[in-house]
């Protein structure tokens, strides 16, 4: 299930609108300079000089960062000063080229301000020092979020992969066999192909009670599936269990399914309650959305996705009339409709192919003489 269909509030991955806006800004500035009537060579000279100043300032900033990283060269860079240098200043060839280009621009291009080269370098160093001390060039939250998403540095990314690799990938392949074993013992309690899945609840507010009946009294625990055991990380016969719940409507059972919360959301909630984690409520909501997005993207590319269904919801956004049991019933009915549609399309395709695959048959009349095509001769 793609993340865009999980819940309307889950954000899409960031695109390239910032670069498009930069292109519009570039065009606007070029048009403004053209209207001002400045000579093209004069504009180009100042542009190159300004870019050289910015790059030289970034080199100064990188050197200040290098002073801190040298303290951690053994713990962070395995004792390699070269790796610490590259981490702060990037490619050394690029740094050398930019430094030579900056020196060339300041030496050979006309200096309209009349300042010596040493003065310009000192002013650049002064400005970068003030930027670092006063944090004048701190990254905006949107920039930090973009960097974390593009580099997969978010807490939610690690939690989603851990949840899939350490849990879902282990239990989902054998889930239908365990449900079949359970049905043999309990007179087919879990009926219908649509319910032979693991329904995973994903509340975006990370409210994960240990008892589902606390979240909604119309969700009633029924039984446990047969246990599954596996050797994991030195633990012999680690046991995995799943629970079957009955969904009630007007006091009567109307559905049965294997149901549970995604436990990493409970971790996010606990982090937001612990001041040592430095995790605000807004950050928790953002990470919960990214967790659902990442988990949906992971499951979209693996065969185990056919054995589970994600139910994403947000109580506050849905209003006070929101009912978790009704939300689960909606997904159960939708799952059945999808499977009926797929089954109907498959059967019609089989019928068509079987009809077309038949050998052609000759229809031979029992009359001695052939009949004309016209009917007015009789």
From Swiss-Prot:
Residues noted as binding 2',3'-cUAMP in the record, renumbered to the chain: 167, 238, 263
Short sequence motif pLxIS motif: positions: 362-365
Pfam families assigned: STING_LBD, STING_TM
Site (Not phosphorylated) residue list: 357
UniProt catalytic activity: H(+)(in) = H(+)(out)
Subcellular location: Endoplasmic reticulum membrane; Cytoplasm, Perinuclear region; Endoplasmic reticulum-Golgi intermediate compartment membrane; Golgi apparatus membrane
Positions of 2',3'-cGAMP binding: 162, 167, 238, 263
Covalent lipidation (S-palmitoyl cysteine), chain numbering: 88, 91
Matches recorded under Gene3D superfamilies: 1.20.5.5200, Stimulator of interferon genes protein (3.40.50.12100)
Record region (Cyclic dinucleotide-binding domain (CBD)): 153-339
Protein keywords: Cell membrane, Cytoplasm, Cytoplasmic vesicle, Endoplasmic reticulum, Golgi apparatus, Immunity, Innate immunity, Ion channel, Ion transport, Lipoprotein, Membrane, Mitochondrion, Mitochondrion outer membrane, Nucleotide-binding, Palmitate, Phosphoprotein, Transmembrane, Transmembrane helix, Transport
Domain of life the protein comes from: Eukaryota
Modified sites of kind Phosphoserine: 354, 365
Modified sites of kind Phosphothreonine: 355
GO MF assignments: 2',3'-cyclic GMP-AMP binding; cyclic-di-GMP binding; proton channel activity; signaling adaptor activity
Keyword Phosphoprotein: yes
A single BP term in Gene Ontology: positive regulation of type I interferon production
Binding residue positions for 3',3'-c-di-GMP: 162, 167, 238-241, 263
One GO cellular component term: Golgi membrane
Subunit note: Homodimer; forms a homodimer in absence of cyclic nucleotide (c-di-GMP or cGAMP). Homotetramer; in presence of cyclic nucleotide (c-di-GMP or cGAMP), forms tetramers and higher-order oligomers through side-by-side packing. Interacts (when phosphorylated) with IRF3; following activation and phosphorylation on the pLxIS motif by TBK1, recruits IRF3. Interacts with TBK1; when homodimer, leading to subsequent production of IFN-beta.
Domain comment as written in the entry: In absence of cGAMP, the transmembrane and cytoplasmic regions interact to form an integrated, domain-swapped dimeric assembly. In absence of cyclic nucleotide (c-di-GMP or cGAMP), the protein is autoinhibited by an intramolecular interaction between the cyclic dinucleotide-binding domain (CBD) and the C-terminal tail (CTT). Following cGAMP-binding, the cyclic dinucleotide-binding domain (CBD) is closed, leading to a 180 degrees rotation of the CBD domain relative to the transmembrane domain.
Annotated function: Facilitator of innate immune signaling that acts as a sensor of cytosolic DNA from bacteria and viruses and promotes low production of type I interferon (IFN-alpha and IFN-beta). Compared to other mammals, STING1-dependent type I interferon induction is strongly reduced in bats, suggesting that the cGAS-STING pathway promotes a limited inflammatory response. Innate immune response is triggered in response to non-CpG double-stranded DNA from viruses and bacteria delivered to the cytoplasm.
Record family assignment: Belongs to the STING family.
Protein's recorded name: Stimulator of interferon genes protein
Organism name: Rhinolophus ferrumequinum (Greater horseshoe bat)
Lineage: Eukaryota, Metazoa, Chordata, Craniata, Vertebrata
